[in-house]
């Protein structure tokens, strides 16, 4: 199971090797994931305004859906209220404490990087290519 569905969370934890492990949501926590993230100068999270791929949209910023109660729909849980943050399984709370978390929304569909989004992500956080031709090609 690839999808993290709150109403089937136990099944997700039992069978999702990819997301469960990289989110440190399994019974055994991988300290190297947390250590690696904490070495970052900044952790930049980008979500897309018209995204239909990432559900819930909050999960682009490590938010989630709650486990629904009887007769109630699941509700969005922002990052700072999620288990991964509160229990600091990945070091996100520690990064946040030192001001290293960055949250951005780019206009458009999932991974459809507009020139403005490319400028933000690559210009501000990654760095511009050394060759001006490459920068122009990225913005084409």
Descriptions of predicted regions:
Residues 1-140:
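Lipid deacylating catalytic domains
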């Amino acid at each position: 199971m690839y999808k993290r569905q709150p109403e089937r969370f136990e099944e997700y934890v039992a069978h999702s090797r990819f997301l469960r492990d990289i989110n440190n949501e399994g019974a055994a926590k991988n300290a190297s994931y947390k250590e690696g993230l904490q070495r970052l100068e900044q952790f930049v999270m980008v979500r897309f305004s018209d995204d239909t791929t990432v559900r819930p949209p909050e999960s682009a910023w490590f938010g989630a859906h709650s486990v629904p109660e009887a007769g109630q729909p699941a509700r969005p849980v922002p990052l700072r209220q999620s288990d991964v943050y509160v229990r600091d399984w990945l070091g996100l709370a520690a990064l946040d404490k030192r001001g290293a978390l960055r949250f951005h929304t780019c206009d458009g569909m999932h991974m459809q990087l507009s020139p403005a989004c490319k400028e933000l992500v690559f210009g501000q956080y990654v760095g511009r290519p050394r060759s001006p031709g490459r920068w122009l090609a990225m913005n084409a």
